[in-house]
Each structure stands twice: as structure tokens, then as C-alpha cells.
């Protein structure tokens, strides 16, 4: 499957009841060393399992880990949603961990341009840098249009330089995953 174009790694969501215990019951224990050995990156919806990410990142320093959805729990917004942000920011000390800003608009109680979460995004950017902060949409559950999901990052975050925008909006994830999209 890794020889198929665009197939680069695993993504685990742990959102279905049978999967909910996998991160803590040993089910996933074999994945980490094998993924590291084979150079397969792993993306995680780790909002309820953030405490497991640091030990994995430390034990398997060559395993690329991407925390999806900013490490947030769905259904919460603003300060309530970002209450555990310090725990996620602490992961920046591991160069093999990156953050995907998937679904960012949904974590704001406001409307476009979702100003109530800009400071949180800025903290993530300041901590992880543009090389390890990746844009994403999860468009099917966004409170805005596709264009607004894009322009929130490309036009509404003044602290992103043009070079940073290029990284956050796609170049950085390609670099992080060694994903050659030139073909």
C-alpha cells in the first residue's frame, strides 16, 4: 500500500467505541516501533490521549507523529476548547511531533474570521514554528466556506509572513513527511 501515490502513513482517530481503549490497553504498542522502523508517519486524533504522545515521541525519536485537530476536543470552543493547550505545546520539544490545524474554525464561537482563536493559533505557531504547523480543513463540519477556511490562514493571521503561509498551507507537511508531490 505504501507504493500507491499519496499513501504515506497511518491515521488513527480512536473515535469509535471499540477503538477508544486502543491507546491505553496495549493494542497500539506494536505500531510505534514498527512504524518507526519502516519510516511510516502516524497521525493521531489525540485530544483525549495527549499524555500518551510525549512518551511515544521520546521513545521513538525517528517516528514522525502528527497531532490532528490541534489536539482539541470537538464540541468545545474558545477558552474551554484550548484549556489543555499547554500540554500540547509541551510536545514541541520533540522534533518528530507536528500539529495539524484541521478544523480550526470550529473551535471558535465567533464567525469568520474567528478572531477568538487567533491568539491560540499564534501560540501554536510560536511554539512549533511554521515547519511543524500544518493547515487542514475537515470541511464537512466547518461553520464556514472552503474559501474562508483558507483565507482565515492566508489573509487573517497577520503574523504569518508570506514564506510562513507557504509552509503552513502545504510545503511544511510535504517536507515533514518527505512527500514529493512533483510527480
Question: Where are the predicted features?
Answer:
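Active-site gating/metal-coordination segments in enzymes
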Residues: 1-48, 55, 100-104
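Short, well-ordered coil/turn segments that N-cap beta-strands
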Residues: 5-8, 36-41, 61-64, 93-97, ...
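Conserved, mostly hydrophobic/aromatic
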Residues: 10, 35, 69, 99, ...
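Charged helix-capping and loop-helix junction motifs
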Residues: 23-30, 50, 79-87, 113-121
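Conserved anion-binding
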Residues: 45, 56, 66-72
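Histidine/acidic-residue-rich catalytic or RNA/ligand-binding cores of hydrolases
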Residues: 54-58, 76-82, 109-119, 139-155, ...
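Aromatic-anchored helix/helix-loop segment that forms the rim or "lid"
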Residues: 85-127, 133
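Mid-to-C-terminal alpha-helical segments outside catalytic/metal-binding sites
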Residues: 122-123, 127-134, 141-183
